[in-house]
Amino acid sequence: MTQQSNLKTVTGWALIIVAVFSAYLIKFFDDFNLAFLLFLLFQLVLIFRYKNVFSPGMRTVSRLLLGAVFLYSGFVKGVDPMGTAYRIEDYFVAFGTDWLMFSALFFSFLLNAAELVLGGMLILHIKPKLTSLLVLLMMGVFTLVTLNDALNNPVPDCGCFGDALILTNWQTFYKNLLLNVLVLIVFLHRKSIRRLYPDKTELAIG
């Protein structure tokens, strides 16, 4: 390996390790902290700046970590769909859309199913280009919603991980910023992703 190749490898793994370590640091920042927020945003900038340093192995690790988080989130909420429905009702009240109350349980099942399906597709590497796009869109929505939660506090708890892991609104926003690090690593390399299974196999797995 050349010196430049070694530098790319070190840089890529360093960015991933820093992101994982930052997830641990979230426990110490339960409210707004400008320094920590800038630190997380800087990581996102670095992902764009050094997007070419991520090897296939690094992309795989990022994909598996992201898939595991989606599966965990979908599972812990899925075991208590009514609890998730109550959280959704809180949002309906906060945004003045009380007339949607009747659909809270439906959206609870839909959200949990979407996270479980996307998590499984990430782990199993099914339709990687489509999956990376859908995950990017979902995380974009989640990030905007949790930014509003952090700034305006319309609900006390988004219930992102059900009752298994209670986070403040700012911690939830920080968490989503870090997840976006993994999302970008996967999404920015979607054109170079090779499918592992033919269409019939993917359909059978699904």
Where are these regions (language model features)?
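N-terminal membrane topogenic signal
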Residues: 2-15, 53-62
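Membrane-embedded alpha-helical segments in integral membrane proteins
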Residues: 16-28, 44, 89-93
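Membrane-embedded alpha-helical segments of integral membrane proteins
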Residues: 21-36, 137-198
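Central hydrophobic cores of alpha-helical transmembrane segments in multi-pass inner-membrane proteins
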Residues: 37-49, 114-121
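Structural signal for the C-terminal ends of transmembrane alpha-helices
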Residues: 44-53, 123-127, 185-194
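Functionalized membrane-embedded alpha-helices
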Residues: 58-78, 104-145
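Perimembrane loop-to-helix junctions flanking transmembrane segments
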Residues: 85-102
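Internal/C-terminal transmembrane anchor helices
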Residues: 197-206
